[in-house]
From Swiss-Prot:
Annotated function: F(1)F(0) ATP synthase produces ATP from ADP in the presence of a proton or sodium gradient. F-type ATPases consist of two structural domains, F(1) containing the extramembraneous catalytic core and F(0) containing the membrane proton channel, linked together by a central stalk and a peripheral stalk. During catalysis, ATP synthesis in the catalytic domain of F(1) is coupled via a rotary mechanism of the central stalk subunits to proton translocation. This protein is part of the stalk that links CF(0) to CF(1). It either transmits conformational changes from CF(0) to CF(1) or is implicated in proton conduction.
Location in the cell: Cell membrane
HAMAP family for the chain: ATP_synth_delta_bact
Subunit structure: F-type ATPases have 2 components, F(1) - the catalytic core - and F(0) - the membrane proton channel. F(1) has five subunits: alpha(3), beta(3), gamma(1), delta(1), epsilon(1). F(0) has three main subunits: a(1), b(2) and c(10-14). The alpha and beta chains form an alternating ring which encloses part of the gamma chain. F(1) is attached to F(0) by a central stalk formed by the gamma and epsilon chains, while a peripheral stalk is formed by the delta and b chains.
InterPro entries recorded: ATP_synth_OSCP/delta_N_sf, ATPase_OSCP/d_CS, ATPase_OSCP/dsu
Membrane-related topology note: Peripheral membrane protein
Protein name per Swiss-Prot or TrEMBL: ATP synthase subunit delta
SUPFAM superfamilies in the record: N-terminal domain of the delta subunit of the F1F0-ATP synthase (SSF47928)
Gene behind this protein: atpH
UniProt cross-references to Pfam families, sorted A to Z: OSCP
Family: Belongs to the ATPase delta chain family.
One term under GO cellular component: proton-transporting ATP synthase complex
């Protein structure tokens, strides 16, 4: 079974439990914290993914690094390690977040701009997008100086590119055809 299918099944099972417990948001945050730590800390990733390190040692490591994580989520992570599915954890976190977002009518939106946008601009954008989409918006922003100006807005799987860089690329293509 592919890693994505495994991740989807584990995420769905955990989501069903979390929804019953009313802890879906807490679990999503916990899974994202584990996933982020895997991405950012090569030592943690190396130990967790190493085949010769006993499962019990990996479980102790999870307990040590994430002492405040929900006990039920900790048990889930222990199960994932016991089944040898630790490499699927980042995808499980992503799948779980999608399930939570879908259940709570949340649309993840990422705004990329050439400069840091003021909070009032982001708040206004969030409000307008919520009105247009009739969904709750989880807005994140990042800076990419290569855009020169303007913004790129990613709404779920759609992208609205209103950057100067994109407009210059389109102008260049138009001039090449002329």
């Amino acid at each position: 079974m592919s890693e994505q299918n495994v991740a989807r099944r584990y995420a769905r099972a955990l989501f069903n439990i979390a929804r019953e417990q009313g802890t879906a948001g807490e679990f999503a945050n916990g899974l994202e914290e584990v996933s982020r730590t895997l991405a950012e800390n090569s030592d943690f990733r190396r130990v967790l993914y190493h085949q010769l390190i006993p499962v019990r040692e990996k479980q102790k490591l999870i307990d040590t690094i994430f002492p405040d994580i929900n006990p039920l989520l900790k048990n889930f992570l222990h199960l994932v390690l016991a089944k040898g599915r630790e490499r699927a954890l980042p995808e499980m976190a992503a799948q779980f977040r999608r399930l939570v977002d879908q259940a709570e009518n949340i649309l993840p939106v990422e705004v990329t701009s050439a400069i840091t946008l003021r909070e009032d601009i982001l708040a206004g954008l969030k409000e307008r997008l919520a009105g247009i989409t009739r969904r709750n918006i989880r807005l994140s922003s990042r800076v990419n100086p290569e855009l020169i100006g303007g913004v790129v807005i990613r709404l779920g799987d759609r992208v609205l590119d209103a950057s100067v860089k994109k407009k210059l690329e389109l102008l260049g293509e138009h001039l090449k055809r002329a």
